[in-house]
């Protein structure tokens, strides 16, 4: 089992959701497909293997996340993070400043892809940008050295504004964009 990938992913998703919703001290419920959880934990992507792995993961990190409830949901699991866990993760997350900047930029009326790229470049000189090469998105963007995070950001410019979607590297590759 490789828990660090799930820990990094959860940290990024919790911070992003808390910042977008403005709820740094509220519980969050996050739904993950079994395939993503299996890739992140390095275990078989079936519910019988994942449930005990998730319970062990959160038991070992109760000081950070609190008492997380792990429940089956459709083709994956719902991870219910209590308010105190959300607050601790947001306070400790190294990528919070970048995400705050990116979210504020994306929420600015008329924000363009260039505006979003500028947010990346305010936080690193090692920003990789390439055409996405698919019909879903215009650009693929990520930090070459994984700092401040290792997510893959897909930027789409449409209807006069730009938006982004964020994926773990493994999920991005598995989706085959």
What are these regions (language model features)?
Residues 28, 38-67:
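Charge-enriched amphipathic alpha-helical scaffolds
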Residues 149-162:
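A short, surface-exposed beta-strand/turn
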Residues 24-43, 98-106:
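Short glycine-rich, basic-tinged beta-strand/loop micro-motifs
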Residues 60-92, 161:
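Charged low-complexity interaction tracts in eukaryotic proteins
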Residues 2-30:
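Positively charged, polyanion-binding regions of nucleic-acid-associated proteins
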Residues 95-126:
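Short helix/turn-capping signatures at newly exposed starts of structured segments
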Residues 114-152:
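A cross-family detector of function-defining hotspots
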Residues 160-177:
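A short, surface-exposed interaction/processing loop segment used at functional sites
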């Amino acid at each position: 089992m490789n828990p660090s990938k799930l820990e990094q992913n959860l940290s990024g998703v919790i911070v992003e959701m808390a910042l977008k919703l403005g709820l740094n001290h509220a519980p969050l419920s996050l739904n993950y497909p079994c395939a993503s959880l299996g890739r992140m934990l390095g275990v078989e992507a079936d519910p019988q293997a994942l449930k005990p792995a998730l319970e062990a993961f959160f038991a070992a990190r109760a000081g950070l996340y609190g008492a997380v409830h792990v429940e089956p949901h459709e083709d994956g699991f719902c991870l219910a993070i209590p308010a105190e866990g959300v607050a601790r993760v947001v306070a400790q997350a190294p990528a919070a400043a970048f995400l705050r900047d990116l979210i504020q930029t994306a929420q600015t009326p008329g924000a363009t892809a260039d505006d979003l790229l500028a947010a990346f470049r305010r936080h690193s000189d090692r920003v990789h940008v390439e055409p996405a090469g698919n019909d879903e998105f215009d650009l693929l963007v990520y930090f070459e050295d994984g700092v401040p995070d290792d997510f893959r950001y897909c930027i789409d410019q449409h209807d006069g504004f730009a938006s982004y979607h964020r994926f773990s590297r493994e999920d991005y590759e598995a989706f085959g964009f």
